[in-house]
């Protein structure tokens, strides 16, 4: 209440002091509520996945309000706080991006509930941030530095998230210890299959829609899969299985390359005729 009263008193003063106070106000509150929720989760003996969800939930809520209900965050300054919208959103997404990347490397247990891919607290939180990020990239408040890279950033984040979901599925369903999951043969084979599916989808969709960038991304991912088969999976699969995997890869690339040829390059502007 004292904080609200202070903001109301600063409303009439205007200027940078009032905006800075309200800016800090909307950073303090998600921190306080998130820490309180984490403390409750610890004393309730909830697993780490729940604790992370409760820690980040207030930040996600504040970020969503900044995208869809800005007037709620702008009060009591109202229009005077509008110049801070882009900076506040950038701060929110910057902090959440660091937490998101860190959370990809956590086991993310959902106890006492069973772990289900995507439908678990940690990955639902990660997915929520991806959705908010997609919405942010379509707004005018997106920093100019990020605008040329928004498609690549979203694609890279989606790829990392799907890879993380795959590794977590191996960890829980194949009973592979999380610290050594990347060195496990089942995990590496699973990544090969998932990456191949993503590469084929990129190939096909890029060809059907005439999006050369998407088609090239699929082709690059399939090249990564080939390198992975040569350097990693062959040792895990053995000679016979390794040879079979190469044959299957070659047939897959041949069929997909025939059905989904490269889209034409973008037409270059015609040269002006010289007099």
Question: Where are the language model's segments positioned?
Answer:
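Alpha-helical transmembrane segments of multi-pass membrane proteins
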Residues: 1-275
């Amino acid at each position: 209440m004292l904080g609200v009263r202070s903001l109301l008193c600063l409303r009439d003063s205007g200027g940078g002091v009032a905006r800075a106070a309200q800016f800090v106000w909307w950073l303090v509150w998600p921190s306080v509520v998130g820490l309180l929720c984490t403390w409750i989760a610890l004393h309730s003996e909830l697993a780490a996945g729940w604790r992370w969800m409760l820690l980040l939930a207030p930040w996600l809520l504040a970020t969503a309000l900044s995208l869809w209900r800005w007037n709620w965050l702008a009060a009591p300054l109202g229009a005077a706080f509008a110049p801070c919208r882009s900076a506040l959103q950038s701060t929110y997404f910057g902090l959440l991006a660091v937490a998101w990347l860190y959370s990809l490397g956590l086991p993310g247990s959902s106890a006492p509930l069973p772990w289900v891919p995507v439908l678990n607290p940690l990955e639902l939180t990660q997915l929520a941030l991806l959705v908010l990020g997609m919405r942010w990239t379509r707004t005018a408040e997106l920093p100019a530095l990020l605008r040329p890279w928004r498609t690549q950033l979203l694609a890279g984040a989606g790829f990392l998230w799907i890879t993380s979901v795959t590794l977590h599925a191996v960890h829980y369903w194949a009973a592979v210890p999380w610290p050594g999951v990347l060195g496990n043969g089942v995990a590496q084979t699973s990544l090969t299959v998932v990456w191949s599916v993503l590469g084929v989808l990129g190939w096909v969709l890029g060809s059907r829609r005439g999006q050369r960038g998407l088609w090239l991304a699929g082709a690059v991912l399939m090249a990564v899969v080939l390198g992975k088969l040569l350097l990693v999976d062959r040792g895990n699969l053995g000679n016979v299985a390794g040879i079979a995997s190469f044959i299957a890869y070659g047939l897959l690339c041949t069929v997909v390359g025939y059905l989904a040829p490269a889209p034409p390059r973008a037409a270059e502007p015609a040269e002006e005729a010289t007099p």
